[in-house]
């Protein structure tokens, strides 16, 4: 007999059914740039009365220094191909992004047209004009755009352009730069999710997420909507173990963001997945209950209700 104490039972009275829907729908935190956590936010440093030796302290702070060292990304225009439409031909450039400092098994690959780069340049000039005076954008050519020589030269120029942009801190953390590299794939992925095309959505998320996580390493919560979308797809494709693993990644991104709009819906989904998988969900349920006690008058949307509202424009 189903018990009301168990997720998914008819009498289940989880906080998802007891709170009020919030309407804030920004994908990233408000403001032009993403917040940048730093060493001052670390909570696991040695206390003032620590018994660690001098050498141990040196090793600890060396690890802390490495932990907060800025992640460097390398950009390469790996290849180019000519796309032919009914009334036009244009070149698609394959952009590969690799993280330095360690073996990167999740190199990110996207394709963009010259016109996409051009729109990015215009948006960045509008916002960061003076800071881009040393950044050279490849000039537009009226003829010969499809010649092998021109394509090869432009590949080198676009690679250098991305390198110079990334060197400007304000630019690499800007919404414009992030959207240029991730928004087309994410928008299509969330559109597929809304249409119930979960396999296709997962494929697109698999391409976009590694890059989004690299670009927002200073703000892990920025990747939470996409991670939760992957959870929803995997769950609805009846792949609960994989869905649970993705959910754990999302929860790690929110470990200091308990007021985040995805926090309670994600916990609720994880409780239900844990129960379905036969896992101990007591700790997850406890976190969910504590969150509900802090916000007794709120009703959260379900995780799926949240994700289908993303990237509507």
Curated annotation (Swiss-Prot):
Gene Ontology CC: one annotated term: nucleus
Its membrane topology is listed as: Peripheral membrane protein
- Residue ranges occupied by any PX domain in the UniProt entry: 71-188
Q: Where does a 1,2-diacyl-sn-glycero-3-phospho-(1D-myo-inositol-3-phosphate) bind?
A: 113, 115, 140, 154
Where is the PTM Phosphoserine found along the chain?
3
SUPFAM superfamilies per UniProt: PX domain, TPR-like
Record-level Gene Ontology MF annotations: phosphatidylinositol-3-phosphate binding; phosphatidylinositol-4,5-bisphosphate binding
User: How does inactivating the gene affect the organism?
Assistant: No visible phenotype. Mice appear healthy and normal. Neutrophils from mutant mice display unchanged Selplg-mediated cell-cell adhesion and Selplg expression at the cell membrane is unchanged.
Identify its protein family: Belongs to the sorting nexin family.
Free-text note on domains in this protein's UniProt record: The PX domain binds phosphatidylinositol 3-phosphate which is necessary for localization to the endosomes.
What is the protein's given name? Answer: Sorting nexin-20
Species of the source: Mus musculus (Mouse)
